[in-house]
């Protein structure tokens, strides 16, 4: 069964790249065409790469690995936190702190401090202190919670990272590559594919696109966790809310993809030839 369908990708605007004057030439092979000065991503390739990334994430988690979800841009913050939390994985959706991976021993000490402050607050450890001291400790706790709350239970560097917008998260990507940690990421038309091990060509600026692809990765994690626990496979297809009707040209793309897929796999739910 298809992990995600061409229709879902189109509904989410995953096929829209950047303006033609803002692009990385290395992305040329992932571009289907351009329309009104906007690059249109080849969603047929997107589907293929989604399957590869999905399988990698599923197998990584099934064998005891963890995936760190990273997306600090406004459009990704909510879905990154929600999907990572849904499958019990660590996440960073606020500012990436330099050294979060390459200097994890120091970060781990800050996590211990966060837990210490939380325990103090919950067990009355703030009692007997001056208002100024309590205020200082509370501010310290809140600051740590804001920057490290998503990785509070991460005891070691992750097995892989999922990234929304590799340009914005270039520090995270650089640290992962330095440590040999596989990078799975959305590749918009202004990104560098050489920095990513498991690319998914797509729109990393639209909220719906980032949410859909993040949900796909989280579903792969969920399936990996099921395999690890010896539970049967569930339906990995992510649910998507109803979308705006497709434009006529987008309907043509979908029809073209479906028509091409039909002879190959009759009745297969996954379209096979779509531009974007």
UniProtKB/Swiss-Prot annotation:
Disulfide bonds: none annotated. One of its GO terms (biological process) is translation. Keywords: Ribonucleoprotein, Ribosomal protein. Residues 255-276 are annotated as: Disordered. InterPro entries: Ribosomal_uS2, Ribosomal_uS2_bac/mit/plastid, Ribosomal_uS2_CS, Ribosomal_uS2_flav_dom_sf. CDD domains: RPS2 (cd01425). Belongs to the universal ribosomal protein uS2 family. This is Small ribosomal subunit protein uS2. The gene is rpsB.
């Amino acid at each position: 069964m298809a992990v995600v369908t061409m229709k879902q990708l189109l509904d989410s605007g995953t096929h829209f790249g950047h303006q033609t004057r803002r692009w990385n030439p290395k992305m040329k092979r992932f571009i289907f065409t351009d329309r009104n000065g906007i690059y249109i991503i080849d969603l047929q390739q997107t589907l293929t790469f989604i399957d590869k990334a999905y399988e990698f994430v599923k197998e990584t988690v099934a064998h005891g690995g963890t995936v760190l979800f990273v997306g600090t841009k406004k459009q990704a913050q909510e879905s990154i936190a929600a999907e990572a939390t849904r499958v019990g994985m660590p996440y960073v959706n606020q500012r990436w702190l330099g050294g979060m991976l390459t200097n994890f021993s120091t970060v781990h000490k800050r996590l211990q401090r966060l837990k210490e402050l939380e325990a103090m607050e919950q067990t009355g450890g703030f009692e007997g202190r001056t208002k100024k001291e309590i205020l200082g400790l509370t501010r310290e706790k809140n600051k740590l919670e804001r920057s490290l709350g998503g990785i509070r239970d991460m005891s070691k560097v992750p097995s892989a990272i999922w990234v929304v917008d590799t340009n914005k998260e270039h520090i995270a990507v650089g640290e992962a590559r330095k440590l040999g940690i596989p990078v799975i990421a959305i590749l918009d038309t202004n990104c560098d594919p050489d920095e990513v091990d498991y690319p998914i060509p797509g729109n990393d600026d639209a909220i719906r696109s980032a949410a859909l692809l993040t949900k796909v990765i989280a579903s792969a994690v969920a399936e990996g966790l099921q395999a690890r626990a010896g539970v049967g496979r569930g339906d990995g297809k992510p649910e998507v809310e109803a979308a705006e009707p497709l434009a006529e040209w987008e309907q043509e793309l979908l029809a073209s993809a479906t028509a091409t897929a039909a002879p190959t796999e009759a009745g297969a739910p996954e379209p096979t030839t779509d531009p974007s």
